[in-house]
């Protein structure tokens, strides 16, 4: 069986020649050069991904939702009962949650994966990759062992690669877990070097009078566990959670197949920061769907060098933003593959990117 290091070494580089060809093709389409801006840039980015073989296209779509509980819930950093994780995961299997609605609209399948829900028995209908019944309380101990983190990463990478073999070409990540914005903030603080006060937000409607405690919990977790910001696995194992590890695994797995993965909100930014520490080569495969309303979102995205496509003031999680942005990916592919060409219409435009066909 391949090790994590072996799999990380298989992540292919983006193909600059394919991107150059895509740029020339797009510049010849029936529009002023550059007039579709970020949509054009997205199509060119997709063309450079080896898994799409130089032609931006979307086959099957999948949103992978990592579900887990967190020991740090005991510190009073969330107002929702811990049992909500299992209840909502079960609702996902019925197709009744927010991500299920948005994924259905986008034509994507939702894979609900138990990586650490705190229930006595596995929940029927979930994909069972459970490591433990919740992670450790990061305010008093590591979230998990390094071995547990590496094994879960490998399991999720392999699952993602298997989906790719079965025709999935566009992945989205999501999560579900009460109190999980606390470890996410700890990861963001650790890797960006920003103070917890700058990145800790209210999560799922935490009252503002409880925010100081949440900031203190994140600060204590980092001080106690001393995660190495240069080592993504170490950060995830010490101050992360199983859902965050799982999302990082999807990113690494998709990138190893040369395929795009849509980020969701703040939790996914944290997982992406850790994944990029493991392999900077994955960064061109990450597509930011929307700007999370969580406090540390801009800090995390700035560190990643990513600019989201949507700003809907959302902070639901679940992969809702990733599902919502899937039609944008398809739109970029549509203009690339289906638009007419200037030459075929005998239109000659001056080399002015601000020109307009109607001017």
Swiss-Prot record:
Pathway: Nucleoside biosynthesis; alpha-ribazole biosynthesis; alpha-ribazole from 5,6-dimethylbenzimidazole: step 1/2. InterPro entries: Nict_dMeBzImd_PRibTrfase, Nict_dMeBzImd_PRibTrfase_bact, Nict_dMeBzImd_PRibTrfase_N, Nict_dMeBzImd_PRibTrfase_sf. Keywords: Cobalamin biosynthesis, Glycosyltransferase, Transferase. It holds the Pfam family DBI_PRT. The keyword Endoplasmic reticulum does not apply. Its EC number is 2.4.2.21. The active site is at residue 318. It catalyses: 5,6-dimethylbenzimidazole + nicotinate beta-D-ribonucleotide = alpha-ribazole 5'-phosphate + nicotinate + H(+). One of its GO terms (biological process) is cobalamin biosynthetic process. GO terms for molecular function: nicotinate-nucleotide-dimethylbenzimidazole phosphoribosyltransferase activity. It comes from the Bacteria. Catalyzes the synthesis of alpha-ribazole-5'-phosphate from nicotinate mononucleotide (NAMN) and 5,6-dimethylbenzimidazole (DMB). Belongs to the CobT family. Homodimer. This is Nicotinate-nucleotide--dimethylbenzimidazole phosphoribosyltransferase. It comes from Shigella dysenteriae serotype 1 (strain Sd197).
């Amino acid at each position: 069986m391949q090790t994590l290091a072996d799999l990380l070494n298989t992540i292919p580089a983006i193909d600059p020649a394919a991107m150059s060809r895509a740029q020339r093709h797009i510049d010849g389409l029936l529009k002023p050069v550059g007039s579709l801006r970020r949509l054009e840039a997205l199509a060119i980015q997709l063309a450079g991904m080896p898994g799409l073989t130089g032609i931006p296209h979307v086959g099957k779509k999948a949103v992978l939702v990592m579900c887990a509980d967190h020991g740090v819930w005991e510190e009073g950093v969330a107002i929702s009962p811990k049992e909500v994780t299992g209840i909502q995961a079960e609702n996902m299997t019925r197709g009744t949650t927010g991500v299920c609605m948005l994924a259905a609209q986008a034509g994507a399948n939702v894979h609900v994966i138990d990586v650490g829900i705190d229930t006595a028995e596995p929940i029927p209908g979930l994909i069972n990759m459970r490591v433990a019944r919740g992670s450790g309380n990061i305010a008093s101990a590591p979230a998990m062992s390094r071995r547990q983190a590496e094994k879960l990463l490998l399991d999720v990478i392999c699952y993602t690669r298997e989906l790719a073999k079965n025709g999935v070409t566009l992945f989205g990540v999501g999560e579900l877990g009460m109190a999980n914005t606390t470890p996410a903030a700890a990861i963001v603080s650790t890797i960006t070097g920003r103070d917890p006060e700058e990145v800790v937000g209210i999560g799922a409607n935490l009252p503002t009078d409880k925010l100081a405690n949440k900031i203190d919990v994140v600060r204590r977790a980092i001080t106690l566990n001393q995660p190495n910001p240069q080592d993504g696995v170490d950060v995830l194992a010490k101050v992360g959670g199983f859902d965050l590890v799982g999302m990082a695994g999807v990113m690494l797995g998709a990138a190893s197949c040369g395929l795009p993965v849509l980020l969701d909100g703040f939790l996914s930014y944290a997982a992406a920061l850790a994944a990029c520490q493991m392999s900077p080569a994955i960064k061109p495969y990450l597509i930011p769907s929307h700007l999370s309303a969580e406090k540390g979102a801009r800090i995390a995205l700035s560190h990643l060098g990513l600019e989201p496509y949507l700003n809907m003031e959302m902070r639901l999680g679940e992969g809702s933003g990733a599902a919502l942005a899937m039609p944008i990916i398809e739109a970029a592919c549509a203009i690339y593959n289906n638009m007419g060409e200037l030459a075929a219409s005998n239109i000659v435009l001056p080399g002015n990117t601000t020109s307009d066909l109607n001017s």
